[in-house]
Amino acid sequence: MDLVEKLKNDVREIEDWIIQIRRKIHEYPELSYKEYNTSKLVAETLRKLGVEVEEGVGLPTAVVGKIRGSKPGKTVALRADMDALPVEENTDLEFKSKVKGVMHACGHDTHVAMLLGGAYLLVKNKDLISGEIRLIFQPAEEDGGLGGAKPMIEAGVMNGVDYVFGIHISSSYPSGVFATRKGPIMATPDAFKIIVHGKGGHGSAPHETIDPIFISLQIANAIYGITARQIDPVQPFIISITTIHSGTKDNIIPDDAEMQGTIRSLDENVRSKAKDYMRRIVSSICGIYGATCEVKFMEDVYPTTVNNPEVTDEVMKILSSISTVVETEPVLGAEDFSRFLQKAPGTYFFLGTRNEKKGCIYPNHSSKFCVDEDVLKLGALAHALLAVKFSNK
């Protein structure tokens, strides 16, 4: 029996076990940096499987498992993120979230379950492994600021790693389909804040004020013009203003207005140009109307997620032995898995969960997001298959 058939047979034995783990985590979701029960479940499960476990790697809720092979070889890292989102779940699932205002709306519950399933398969087939398989259960991917990957890396989780792989469940692809690409696959997210300082006054006499709301509207229109006017329209790039705050009463023109939003890009030159254009636009428009301004960008954001071309080519061939594989366009979401890929070559890929018959049609981060659980065994199988193959390179 070849490797693929052996692992397929083994994963059938634990399909229900993987689903039950996922449901338990889904019922009790935990926000970034607070994944206490989730990380406890992970550590306990790994120990029961006979996996060497280290807790608190870089962050209190981080867990790392190590499976050592029967002979020398490569070190392969597999990663799953664990945190949930501040979303009130709006589904009829029997195992829907029991935590008010918190939901696994991005599928990280499935990521944990699939990697635990992969751990089971790898322990059972330890004789096929060379080197070391490192299982990274990461907190705080959804933080969007520091994120959980950076402190784990600083604590040494990637030391000696030769290859690294990660899976993300996605409703953008049909159930059971793997999707990835060579090179940039996810964007850098530059969060920004623009503050316009004007001069307030009575709503009946706007000519006596420097109206920060009016000025903010001019800035917003001009900023949206950066796309396809200053930046090549064939480049994957977007600017979105997502919050505008100003004022307290209908007859008062306020002193200040604040806007926040995000820039998403895959290319460092495009990113730099966009930020420069934004600063110039804000400064110029505020100057015209006599206002002052501040433009702030979040520091140390997630880098662009860049798949190694050679490794990804091989990954696509390997995954095609267990399901359909498609080459996807870049996604303008962001991921701190990008930090792991800066330390070792590897591949980040999606596993489709869209299934109209089961009502799994809502996007990630939706309050109605649901997952076709039939795909979870595929994720576990993919983890194990890639680990065995690349540990023996």
From Swiss-Prot:
Gene Ontology process terms (BP): proteolysis
Cofactor(s) annotated in UniProt: Zn(2+)
Database matches in SUPFAM superfamilies: Bacterial exopeptidase dimerisation domain (SSF55031), Zn-dependent exopeptidases (SSF53187)
Positions with a binding annotation for Zn(2+): H104, D109, H245
Zinc among keywords: yes
Alphabetized Pfam families for the sequence: M20_dimer, Peptidase_M20
Catalytic residues as annotated in Swiss-Prot or TrEMBL: Y302, E373
EC number: 3.4.17.-
Enzyme class label: hydrolase
Biological role: Can release basic, acidic, aromatic, and, to a lesser extent, aliphatic amino acids.
Family: Belongs to the peptidase M20 family.
Protein's recorded name: Thermostable carboxypeptidase 1
Annotated source species: Saccharolobus solfataricus (strain ATCC 35092 / DSM 1617 / JCM 11322 / P2)
Lineage: Archaea, Thermoproteota, Thermoprotei, Sulfolobales, Sulfolobaceae
